[in-house]
């Protein structure tokens, strides 16, 4: 029986590439998305990967979404925290809404999603959690104080969670890509 992998933001850009690669490697893949229904349906039709719509910035939406995926596909063995947004502007022009949207989606979603799957992984003594950060989480970027802060937080979250679960058969890693020409 194939292991189940869930990729957030898994229907476009980096997430779509990850979803397709996991399917090619033999995983039973689910891809979540937040807003572009047409792109998600096209992705599903072209790749045969089921898609699920929810907002990763909402804990309750993540709980309901994960429950639906696990009911339909089985327990999630691999979680790829990939969903992300930008609301770029210089800090002195940044609104609280721009700050919160990016922090809640790009960092808060790691808690929201991982919290839904970690207990099952611990019980099964197996799990893989991979979070997609960014080079800008390591060096910062003009106009991306919110994004850089969130992506730096992703790195800290991952390191701490890895330590907590190292002896339980769960690996937790972060990938910090450089600049990639893809929409977010």
Label every PLM stretch briefly:
Residues 11-12:
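Conserved glycine-rich cofactor-binding loop
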Residues 54-65, 96:
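The beta1-alpha1 cofactor-binding region of Rossmann-like NAD(H)/NADP(H)-dependent oxidoreductases
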Residues 90-91, 98-103, 129:
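Substrate-binding pocket helix/loop in short-chain dehydrogenase/reductase
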Residues 92, 139-145, 167-168:
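Active-site loop immediately N-terminal to the catalytic Tyr-X3-Lys motif
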Residues 114, 150, 158:
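Active-site helix of classical SDR
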Residues 119, 163-164:
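Alpha-helical segment proximal to the catalytic Tyr-Lys
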Residues 134:
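Residue(s) in the substrate-gating loop at a strand-loop-helix junction
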């Amino acid at each position: 029986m194939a292991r189940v992998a869930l990729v957030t933001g898994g229907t476009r850009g980096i997430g779509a590439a990850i979803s397709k690669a996991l399917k090619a490697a033999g995983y039973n893949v689910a891809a979540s998305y937040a807003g572009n229904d047409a792109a998600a349906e096209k992705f599903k039709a072209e790749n045969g990967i089921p898609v699920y719509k929810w907002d990763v910035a909402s804990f309750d939406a993540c709980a309901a979404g994960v429950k639906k995926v696990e009911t339909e596909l089985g327990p999630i063995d691999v979680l790829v925290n990939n969903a992300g947004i930008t609301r770029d502007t210089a800090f002195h022009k940044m609104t609280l809404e721009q700050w919160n949207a990016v922090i809640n989606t790009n960092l808060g979603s790691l808690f929201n999603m991982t919290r839904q799957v970690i207990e099952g992984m611990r019980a099964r003594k197996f799990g893989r959690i991979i979070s997609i950060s960014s080079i800008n989480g390591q060096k910062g970027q003009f106009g991306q104080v919110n994004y850089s802060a969130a992506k730096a937080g992703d790195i800290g979250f991952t390191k701490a969670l890895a330590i907590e679960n190292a002896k339980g058969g769960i690996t937790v890693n972060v990938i910090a890509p450089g600049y990639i020409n893809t929409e977010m």
